[in-house]
């Protein structure tokens, strides 16, 4: 009989109340004011006209496996009412309810029809055919108030990308007309963006009388309360953008060929190279609507650079921040960029090197912030040398509060080119993209920049003092020496009587094949949506219990994220301990069905907290805040006995149409890496649990995500798409890494030894285990061939093991059989299989399944990507 760790009472627990209150306290800081003429915060609650698709249908977070199931979601309508507002627009909101209900009914009918016609499960169609948001009713009359709030919502999710069309990236015709009507007829008009992915703001910026735009994001199950707190000034927004908001979608260099835009979802050519986000906009002098790092607040700040110091080890900037407003407190972010010299390698205009956020400062209050980052982190990747290099020349240090407000603070002079890391190229091109070049382009500049460079503090960096690290790459592992004697157990390993390698040497090939696979039997409806656990219904899967009875090795539970812990909130088991289903496992997993309790049965409850989505958390630029959110999830993992959280997601926001951008942090790899590390440190401060950073790597497209081939240069791969993962590994040592579905340069990432072993383990020192995304090593083409003209095949189980992809999820008998057969025919060395099994069991034995478990990260000497001190 299965053991369940869920509660048997449906009452709201003290933990739920505590965590909801903490999220409400933290999340307001993440919100970003794009525009404000002083209208926000409102002086108090009162009569208000509230419109928009997000008033009653507030989006707490995106869809798919990243959606956290919660007890309740506080809508913005509810939040405003609870704060004392009288909402006058019930008639309009009722009208939109009907518009939305009709659109959703038509969508569901179309899904069912298409699934029947194509003879595929409805869940396959659901994940590929996105719901098209209907336009809103037209506003025709003014209400009896001087204040109007418009809530614009957008949703997206796993399995499909967005579109550059009305009611998606673009605003609908009626949406724009309604906002313009409010701006014309009301004294105060506030637009609240309940979105996690970008929308076009060019037409909005043309509307006269639009007083404030608040990027509220998707803040979890308390979103409505948090928005009300910010609108009334009870919570102070101090977010800064972690993406560039273009004036036109076509301004993004990836726009022409991204995903479905060019009709080809099989091959994605990364012609933008290293010029992603602000690296492109600044270097090619393209003016955005809102630049990277931008964000207003309820007050103003003055930032003054006090000093810059640098040597062969570190670059250190000391700056003072003062609140020069007279009414409201606030927080400011000091952003430090560097401009590397052009040598034999092109460089962007500037790149983020470090950042630090002030404490909450009252009017007139100041604080000194010191930001330090490793000098070697300014290196670029030289494909010809297969090395990271600091090229000779002048490195300008720039300081500001956004990418378009930086000023030159120092000039670091390096006389000789230095190789910081000597490795080897790992990602040979199969069909190399024609990359952008800045040759002949005049970059962004500003009045006085040349004078700042000439007057900047000059610091010489000792070239010879920067040592070269040479990577030693691993070879195919030999078979473990056989341990002769009694059958070893987990207790023997923990006591020191024998080593884990000794125990693994005793396992049969069949046992190791089971260890290297999850316990499910393929990716059925439950597995497809991440619901393959026997011990925590709604969790994504379990590791094997085949070694429990005779060796004392427990199985562990893995659950989805990253916006909280994804479990089924309410489930029922019969007298034999078996879960009772409604007959529709898809709806059961999304908690859509009420199930009767049979005689002798038991109800269980697993209510978890939905924290802000990653894209919103990153806008805080506050690593301690993100760590606290990780701590929230960690406590709930302990309660429900979850060992591995399948999060954080940390792919790069290469293009705003990626359907899963809400799960990821930023267009910048430093921000992404530091946020993921902070989240991981929060989780892994709890004994026996850990994270799985994902999706490794270059998972920047959802359309045809399992079979798309991403063509990327070695340099762009390393500097943009791997750098964040490298930072997270070196500064937090996540317990696991999840490989992505896609191919990179013709090789499935799940089957890439160069990615999973040479880069992650040999170059970065990753110590945990790697797992596949769900269904990676199964043939899933039958589910997607109806929509995509598939060009590439799927990854294989044998090659996963060869690559160092230790755990295949959710697991199926075919995977196990392929592994056993491959060892038998000599195409899979025994030592390689033993090594994969060893890495999995090494983590399992440190999990919370054992009473002696400790915080996983405590065993590592972790680095710091950026160090911040305040005085």
What is each PLM-predicted segment?
Residues 1-381, 389-404, 422-871:
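Glycoside hydrolase catalytic-domain context in secreted enzymes
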Residues 386:
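Extracellular/periplasmic metallocenter environments
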Residues 405-422:
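Short beta-strand elements
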């Amino acid at each position: 009989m299965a053991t369940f760790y869920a509660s048997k009472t449906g009452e709201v627990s003290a933990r739920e109340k505590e965590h909801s209150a903490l999220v409400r306290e933290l999340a307001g800081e993440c919100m970003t004011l794009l525009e404000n003429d002083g209208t926000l915060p409102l002086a108090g609650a009162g009569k208000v006209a509230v419109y928009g698709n997000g008033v009653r249908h507030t989006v707490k977070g995106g869809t798919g496996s990243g959606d956290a199931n919660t007890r309740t979601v506080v809508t913005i309508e509810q939040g405003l009412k609870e704060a004392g507002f009288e909402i006058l627009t019930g008639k309009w909101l009722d009208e939109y309810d009907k518009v939305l209900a009709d659109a959703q009914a038509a969508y569901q009918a179309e899904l069912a029809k298409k699934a029947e016609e194509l003879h595929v499960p409805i869940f396959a169609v659901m994940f590929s055919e996105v719901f098209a948001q209907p336009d809103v009713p037209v506003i025709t009359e003014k209400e009896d108030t001087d204040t109007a709030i418009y809530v614009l919502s957008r949703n997206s999710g796993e399995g499909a990308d967005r579109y550059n069309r009305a009611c998606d990236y673009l605003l609908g015709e009626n949406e724009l007309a309604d906002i313009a009507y409010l701006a014309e007829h009301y004294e105060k008009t506030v637009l609240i963006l309940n979105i996690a992915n970008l929308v076009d703001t060019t037409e909005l910026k043309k509307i006269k009388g639009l007083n404030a735009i608040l990027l509220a994001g998707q803040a979890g199950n308390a979103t409505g309360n948090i928005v009300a707190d910010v609108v009334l000034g009870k919570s102070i927004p101090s977010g800064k953008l972690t993406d560039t908001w273009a004036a036109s979608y076509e301004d993004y260099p990836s726009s022409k060929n991204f995903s479905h835009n060019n009709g080809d979802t099989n091959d994605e050519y990364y012609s933008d190279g290293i010029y992603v986000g602000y690296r492109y906009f600044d270097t090619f002098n393209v003016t955005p609507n809102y630049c990277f790092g931008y964000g207003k607040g309820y007050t103003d700040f003055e930032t003054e650079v006090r000093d810059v110091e640098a040597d062969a080890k570190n670059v250190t900037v000391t700056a003072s921040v003062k609140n020069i407003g007279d009414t409201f407190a606030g927080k400011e972010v000091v952003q430090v960029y560097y401009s590397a010299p052009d040598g034999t390698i092109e460089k962007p205009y500037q790149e983020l090197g470090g950042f630090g956020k002030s404490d909450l400062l009252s009017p007139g209050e100041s604080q000194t912030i010191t930001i330090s980052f490793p000098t070697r982190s300014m290196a670029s990747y030289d494909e010809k040398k297969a090395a990271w290099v600091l090229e000779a020349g002048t490195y300008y240090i720039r300081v500001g509060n956004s990418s378009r407000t930086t000023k030159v603070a120092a000039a670091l002079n390096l006389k000789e080119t230095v190789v910081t890391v000597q490795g080897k190229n790992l990602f040979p091109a199969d069909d190399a993209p024609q990359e952008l070049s800045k040759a002949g382009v005049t970059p962004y500049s500003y009045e006085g920049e040349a004078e700042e460079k000439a007057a900047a503090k000059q610091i010489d960096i000792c070239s010879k003092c920067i040592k070269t690290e040479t990577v030693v790459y691993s070879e195919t592992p030999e078979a473990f020496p056989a341990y002769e004697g009694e059958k070893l157990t987990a207790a023997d390993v923990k006591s020191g009587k024998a080593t884990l390698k000794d125990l693994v040497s005793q396992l049969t090939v069949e046992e190791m094949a089971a260890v290297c696979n999850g316990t499910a039997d393929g990716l059925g409806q439950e597995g497809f949506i991440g619901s393959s656990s026997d011990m925590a219904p709604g969790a994504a899967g379990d590791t094997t219990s085949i070694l429990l009875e005779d060796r004392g090795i427990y199985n562990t539970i893995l659950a989805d994220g990253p916006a909280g812990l994804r479990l089924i909130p309410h489930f029922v088991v019969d007298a034999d301990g078996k879960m009772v289903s409604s007959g529709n496992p898809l709806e059961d997993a999304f908690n859509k069905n009420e199930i009767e309790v049979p005689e002798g049965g038991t109800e269980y409850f697993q209510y978890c907290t939905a924290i802000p989505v990653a894209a919103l958390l990153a806008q805080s630029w506050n690593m301690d805040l993100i760590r606290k959110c990780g701590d929230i999830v960690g406590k709930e993992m302990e309660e429900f006995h979850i060992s591995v959280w399948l999060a954080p997601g940390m792919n790069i926001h290469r293009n705003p149409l990626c359907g899963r951008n809400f799960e990821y942090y930023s267009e910048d790899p430093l921000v992404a890496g530091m946020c993921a590390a902070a989240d991981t440190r929060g989780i892994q401060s709890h004994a026996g649990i850990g994270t799985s950073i994902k999706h490794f790597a270059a998972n920047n497209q959802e359309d045809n995500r399992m079979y798309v081939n991403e063509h990327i240069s070695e340099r762009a791969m390393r500097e943009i798409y791997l750098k964040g993962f490298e930072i997270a590994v070196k500064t937090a040592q996540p317990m696991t890494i999840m490989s992505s579905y896609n191919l990179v340069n013709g090789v499935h990432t799940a089957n890439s030894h160069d990615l999973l072993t040479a880069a992650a383990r040999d170059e970065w020192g990753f110590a945990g285990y790697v797992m596949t995304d769900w269904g990676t090593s199964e043939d899933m083409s039958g589910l997607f061939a109806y929509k995509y003209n598939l060009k590439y095949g799927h990854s294989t189980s044998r090659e996963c093991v060869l690559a160092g992809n230790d755990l295949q999820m959710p697991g199926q008998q075919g995977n196990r059989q392929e592994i056993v057969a491959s060892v038998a025919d000599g195409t899979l060395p025994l030592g390689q299989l033993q090594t994969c099994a060893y890495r999995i069991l090494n983590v399992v034995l440190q999990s919370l399944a054992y009473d002696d478990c400790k915080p996983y990260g405590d065993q590592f000497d972790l680095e710091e990507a950026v160090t911040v001190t305040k005085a």
